[in-house]
Amino acid sequence: MELFKVMNLPDGHLLQNGKYRLTHVVGQGGFGITYRGVWYTEVKGSLGTVKTEVPICVKEYFFKDYCYREPGSQAVKVHSETGKVLFNKFKEKLIKEAKILSEVHHPYIVNVLEVFEENNTAYIAMEYISGFSLKYMLEKNGILPEATVLKYVRQIGEALQFVHDKSILHLDIKPSNILIDKNGNARLIDFGVSKRYDIEQEETSTTMLTLSKGFASIEQYDNEGTQVFSPRPDIYSLGATMYNLLTC
């Protein structure tokens, strides 16, 4: 627990010269820490300008196997030269995720505000979605009703069709990457292992090989399986997600 406390930024920490304030940690994985926070902004109207606080989430790149913070310091440090190479490589991956998401505006996909670098690492400021993941709902309540699952699958299917039309594959569709918002709609998150393709439908961006067992398609187990654009991997993973929600 003490190690975790050293790894994340303290509650109340300010980023971007006070533009964002972090309130608390909401999640942590191998490559990043996600914080709940607020965005201090201004809303202009006919009666003038009003300062307001907008709830957001901030994803910080933190490669936990190689990174650390010294007590009392906000700067991210890396243990070794080998670690620095990997750290910089995957930092670009995080920035790529943000740039892809910033170009994708769809009612069933999380919105990104901006990406920036600070404290020797990178951050993505994004829309805060009040709700729970399908993974959490499944673990808490058991299998979902068929009509509910069908609704969510249709919504994520629409989101995937939208990104596929832009020659982007998500490549990590699973219950933990689908949030249900306060209006009861499914929202697709985490484009960290996504790939972009050019007009010839050939891969133009590469990411580390990350497979979610039980949800990854056969193509993803082949190093060349996703070099040419095809929506099949995402469709397979969406089908596996539907099966999981109805049977597990």
PLM-predicted stretches and their roles:
Residues 158-168:
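Protein kinase catalytic-loop region centered on the HRD/HxD motif
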Residues 152-153:
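Activation segment signature within eukaryotic-like protein kinase domains
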Residues 204-220:
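Conserved activation segment of eukaryotic-like protein kinases, specifically the C-terminal portion
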Residues 72-103:
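AlphaC helix of the eukaryotic protein kinase fold
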Residues 115:
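Activation-segment/catalytic-loop signature of the eukaryotic protein kinase fold
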Residues 119-133, 137:
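Conserved short submotifs of the Hanks-type protein kinase catalytic core
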